[in-house]
């Protein structure tokens, strides 16, 4: 799962950008970001603080896993928090695809990218091999996001 973009340049948000974040609910109260497998602190879920991306990765050129025709694209992975530009896109991406476990739960949160935060826009790629129906979901990856309110969940 990653964001694919045609630009290797980061932008800075001039004003807060509204988007939607999918959190996977694991066992107990654990909530993970699907990309980073990073547990989200409970204080974040209360809307107290912003959540900064972990990891040192920035944008890297698409490697041999991506077909040769995609060689000019870049991948935003570690160091970014991946969100969706629309609520419908977040809901589509949150559906379990290959592992339909009974304990699978998710939450979708309305979030914002604070003004001044570095971000990049692109499209969501769910899997290199498998379901390609998600390839055109509009996605934004930012260095930092602020949780606003939960929108839906299962």
Question: At which residue positions do the language-model features occur?
Answer:
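Conserved NAD+-utilizing ADP-ribose enzyme module
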Residues: 1-81, 87-154
